[in-house]
Amino acid sequence: MKPHGFDLNRVIFTQSAYYLITGVWPLLHMDSFERITGPKTDKWLVKTVGVLVAAIGGSLMVAARGHTVSREAQLLAAASAAGLSVIDVTYVAKGRIAPVYLLDAISEIALLAATAKLKP
């Protein structure tokens, strides 16, 4: 089933681009990243997460561009979106990260919902 004309390749490609951009951003310009998301104590950890998110994005992009989104790639996309959204909501609620992270949570939940509805 393709809700609203979406197919899994498009959804995964969108997620991959989002992950590449948001993952690389703190690596390229930490100052602007912190202006939007708030100051960070452990910049090395922000960069580590950025590298991992970008790596997931790159892997998903290869799958989407090759029109070969496997169940494994779909699971990686869904699990990543679920995990990141839970972290966002949990730590905003605890006051550890800025409320702007709820925008990321909304994006992640939308990606998760779209990915879960589509079949490879």
Predicted regions and their residues:
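Short amphipathic, positively biased membrane-proximal segments
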Residues: M1-P120
